[in-house]
Amino acid sequence: MAERGQQPPPAKRLCCRPGGGGGGGGSSGGGGGAGGGYSSACRPGPRAGGAAAAAACGGGAALGLLPPGKTQSPESLLDIAARRVAEKWPFQRVEERFERIPEPVQRRIVYWSFPRSEREICMYSSFNTGGGAAGGPGDDSGGGGGAGGGGGGGSSSSPAATSAAATSAAAAAAAAAAAAAAAAGAGAPSVGAAGAADGGDETRLPFRRGIALLESGCVDNVLQVGFHLSGTVTEPAIQSEPETVCNVAISFDRCKITSVTCSCGNKDIFYCAHVVALSLYRIRKPDQVKLHLPISETLFQMNRDQLQKFVQYLITVHHTEVLPTAQKLADEILSQNSEINQVHGAPDPTAGASIDDENCWHLDEEQVQEQVKLFLSQGGYHGSGKQLNLLFAKVREMLKMRDSNGARMLTLITEQFMADPRLSLWRQQGTAMTDKYRQLWDELGALWMCIVLNPHCKLEQKASWLKQLKKWNSVDVCPWEDGNHGSELPNLTNALPQGANANQDSSNRPHRTVFTRAIEACDLHWQDSHLQHIISSDLYTNYCYHDDTENSLFDSRGWPLWHEHVPTACARVDALRSHGYPREALRLAIAIVNTLRRQQQKQLEMFRTQKKELPHKNITSITNLEGWVGHPLDPVGTLFSSLMEACRIDDENLSGFSDFTENMGQCKSLEYQHLPAHKFLEEGESYLTLAVEVALIGLGQQRIMPDGLYTQEKVCRNEEQLISKLQEIELDDTLVKIFRKQAVFLLEAGPYSGLGEIIHRESVPMHTFAKYLFTSLLPHDAELAYKIALRAMRLLVLESTAPSGDLTRPHHIASVVPNRYPRWFTLSHIESQQCELASTMLTAAKGDVRRLETVLESIQKNIHSSSHIFKLAQDAFKIATLMDSLPDITLLKVSLELGLQVMRMTLSTLNWRRREMVRWLVTCATEVGVYALDSIMQTWFTLFTPTEATSIVATTVMSNSTIVRLHLDCHQQEKLASSARTLALQCAMKDPQNCALSALTLCEKDHIAFETAYQIVLDAATTGMSYTQLFTIARYMEHRGYPMRAYKLATLAMTHLNLSYNQDTHPAINDVLWACALSHSLGKNELAAIIPLVVKSVKCATVLSDILRRCTLTTPGMVGLHGRRNSGKLMSLDKAPLRQLLDATIGAYINTTHSRLTHISPRHYSEFIEFLSKARETFLMAHDGHIQFTQFIDNLKQIYKGKKKLMMLVRERFG
């Protein structure tokens, strides 16, 4: 026997924490075919190892494992005992328990100690095995591996029968494993060098590649020495790389692989393909593996000469590698005082586990940490979020297999998350983490909740987790539960009746982190006898129990209830599911749903009895301080998923899981009667109806909108996800009854319902949920559907006058959120959902006048966003004017009414879509008819600005396209034209600056109206109108053939104009030139009247000189529009009015010259000389202009003699 002592680190890998390892905790019935329990999703069959067990009992022929007519001997007692020992006991305990162990017994224990299920190999070599829906691992350790009941030393079974069974089962397992790898690989890329699959190529997954290597015959030299398996795996040559041979070594203990080594240098979380290939070779072909006892046993049988020869040959074969170590050990052994001589015996890496060794599967902690750190450093890019979610899924898979590495792996992940440098950076900058990153933290917290609620967790293990969680929780950068700031809600994760801490001072509460709920859950236990009865039996009832109090343990039918804070109770369900107890989770879920339904009925009764007193005193009570939808523990989603899974898993599959009470002790039956499980459901009900009903209960719950952007987005997201799942279910008559029942409750349950008559001002709106209810109920009960949808339309948080506190603030809610000002970060999304609900109702109500009127009234009352009402108006218009049917005039009127409301809402506010809205309204009114167009023009002042009314509304109404579209007769045209002219004049009176021109245009065909509009312009010209507007109207008048009116307006415009000396590019210059040209064309008198205005308003020399030259080129009145003629002589510059203009022009040049010289730079000298040249031309137009210009130049030379270079240029040019 191997001698054990204090072993040096290289001999043993002590890396596992204590925990409920799952590899050996299941059925003892199977040891059968290699992979006989391995399904296409890497899951065990109905009973792991069942095929092999049946074969061992003579049923092999029926199962196809043996040829017809062949039978197999029963499994030997030696193999049965050896298999159980190999699963449960470390080999050291066997050695210590028995003084001598016969060699055949040792061989069978060593034989059965290797894992026999491929499921674990698959789990540790790929991200996702597809086994998430499978149950616990209790059936894995005995199934899927090993060869029936024999094969290999010491067996008394028939070799031929054993070989046949193993070969057939191996073939089946190979096909199943290939299918499982394909299912697992699709869309689930691995990480690291071993299996990065960006495109979802399953052939690159380590497990799939390992199968391929095995099937290709690439595994050789397989040798099992004790609890150590070794072999070589040949990697075939590919185009870029030559063939390589990898040396693989595997240590195992109690049906778990405890360490792996491969020369391929793989750096990954999971086992490489070579380890997979060698492991599957041992599982599928155990009779082809050379089996030896631990090396210490072999050495024990050698005498001194043999031992010396053995050591010398070993050193000779590997002298370059082991000689230094051999010499060092020899020196230590020969030294009497060396440490090695103080220890009895010597280590043996092939001798199996010691008593103190932890029994868990090999997990490379360093690689887990490195990979998580890498994913976090990528900051959400390159699919890192998806990879981390896959790691979380792997943790859940391990938990379901009851593998202690689940908690161990999550600890490693959490440590890396806590070490993320971005946490402190975000905290310092006061910025929120990204939404995807925040969701990863949520999943982290939820997984810890599952782990600490493990129903079979040891107290010392839970204490260790609690210590670690508190350590993380105390770190400053630990993320808060709500994503933004600490929750103001009290500690609700407890097993006590809720509301006990409702009045706790929120200011004194510490912030709740993502670990707070897991820390609180450490105080929960599973020892409650009522709870154990619920989860351990389908037959737990009490018909003698008639206590109808709120917290009674049974309802009136004798069915068990579970009164606990709902999210906490649902966390128990999630924990049971996560740890592989689906039957127990289902039992508790049913009890919780029945409790919720009973509470719901009592709430309805209570509200009905108190309804009359409600307006007078505050008597309502909200029993849920936290909403269940969007809750960190996702209670509704957990119940829904558990019940929906039960719809897909039949009783036979559920019965395959180990008995939950195996480690908890049997419960006493006492006086309880027994009832079949299906009696816990009403007649006609099923798990599906329960799932749907609990989803409706959760979605319809009245709940306060939480604080913070993230939590509010989470509420919306979770609601939409749950509704999306509901939409996948096809409604039948049974489900419709559930919908009706819940819809009635929602309408009548008052403050307990989010659709009750009275709700809190800050309650989460029901728009999304109501839209789903509406569409679901509409074909079956339209009246109820509309009641639900219309009730849900309200959005009280936007109401300017909130209802009184007595009606809307039940005392529990008021104590938690006292008068805080709501910050609804998701308000835009909520309003969009409100709009979607309204649009759905409008579409459904097409053709129903009464319902359309009701929906319209609701929209006008409850929707406060003009853009959303405009969208609804457009939607209604599109529905009403579909191409394949006649227009729906009622829906068109609804569309028009909504459009009118939009106009009123946006009339006094800025809206960038306003012009689009006005144009659309006119189009809509046109579709409705001529009376609608006339109506909007009659009431234009409540709908439009004067500018919109004249430039868009009236203009469009008067257009030819409108007349043609409506097929108007002369009388109708005149009526519309009269309304348009009236509108135009009213707008011109109210806003002449912007509407005068439009008014004149609209009134052209009516002389009286046109004169009225012109008079309005004249009256406004002296007060509010600008020269630009007056010039525009003046040009219009000239164009229409009214030159004198144009002249009048031009003179009025000139009085408002002021052009300084340097504004030689002013946009009004063309208007001034046009006005002067108009005056010149009308005659000398008109020109004489306008020139003083020009001189007064224009100081720019170039503009004045331009006007002067134009006036001297032609005779005034020669091109007069009225045909009158003046004398053919040109006007003299020495006489008025041109003399005044000439003097003003010369003066402007003088002033401009001095202004320019004040700030002139050398680069502008040449430009200045050209300017003086133009000035000289103007000077010379006067009879003494030469003298004036000479004096002007001399004066410049004297004043600016300091500018020598400039003056030199002046002298050169002008003397």
From Swiss-Prot:
The keyword Metal-binding applies. Keywords: Disease variant, Dwarfism, Intellectual disability, Metal-binding, Neurogenesis, Zinc, Zinc-finger. Residues 1-46, 133-161 are annotated as: Disordered. Transmembrane segments: none annotated. Residues 18-38, 133-155 have a biased composition (Gly residues). A zinc finger (SWIM-type) spans 246-283. GO terms for molecular function: zinc ion binding. GO terms for biological process: striatal medium spiny neuron differentiation. Disulfide bonds: none annotated. GO terms for cellular component: Cul2-RING ubiquitin ligase complex. InterPro entries: Znf_SWIM, ZSWIM4-8_C. involved in nervous system development, important for striatal morphology and motor regulation. It is linked to Acromelic frontonasal dysostosis: A rare variant form of frontonasal dysplasia, an array of abnormalities affecting the eyes, forehead and nose and linked to midfacial dysraphia. The clinical picture is highly variable. Major findings include true ocular hypertelorism, broadening of the nasal root, median facial cleft affecting the nose and/or upper lip and palate, unilateral or bilateral clefting of the alae nasi, lack of formation of the nasal tip, anterior cranium bifidum occultum, a V-shaped or widow's peak frontal hairline. This is Zinc finger SWIM domain-containing protein 6. It comes from Homo sapiens. The lineage of its organism: Eukaryota, Metazoa, Chordata, Craniata, Vertebrata. The gene is ZSWIM6.
